Amino acid sequence: MKKIAFVLLLLVTTITFAQNKNAKVSIEVDGVCLMCKERIEKAAIRAKRVKSAIWNVETHELKLIYDERKTNLKAIQQCIADVGHDTKEIKATDEAYNSVHPCCLYRDKDVQKDHKN
C-alpha cells in the first residue's frame, strides 16, 4: 500500500510540473513616460499568449509572463519594436520610432532630460 501511495504521489508531482508552461522573464525596453508604459504593455499583451506585461518607467524593466509553447521572447520583442520602442535584441525602425508621440521620443537627449525632472 505504501508503494502504491508513493507511486501515485510521484505521478501527480510529475504531471503538475509538466503542465507548467508559463515563462517569467524581464527585459529592458526603452521609453520615458506613462504614455510609453501604456504603449509598451499593450504591444506586449497583443503578442500571442502573453498573460502579463508590466513595464517600470524608472528602471525600463518589462516583466512578462507568457506561454512559451505558443510564443517566444523574440516575437514579443518584435511587437514592442513595431510600436516604436527598442529592446536590447530588436531596435524599432525609424518609421515606427517617429510615429510615437513627441514627448515619447526617448532617443532624444532633450526629451530624456525633460522626463528626469
What does each of the following model-derived ranges do?
Residues 1-23:
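Bacterial Sec-dependent N-terminal signal peptides
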Residues 12, 27-30, 97-98:
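Processing junctions and N-termini across compartments
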Residues 97-117:
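Short, low-order "capping/linker" segments at domain edges
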Residues 67-73:
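Helix N-cap motif at beta-to-alpha junctions
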Residues 57-65, 95-101:
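Surface-exposed aromatic
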Residues 39-43, 75-83:
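Short amphipathic alpha-helices in soluble, non-transmembrane regions
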Residues 26-54, 58-61:
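N-terminal targeting signals for Sec/Tat export/insertion, comprising classic cleavable signal peptides
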Residues 84-96:
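Conserved short beta-strand edge segments in small beta-sheet-based binding/regulatory domains
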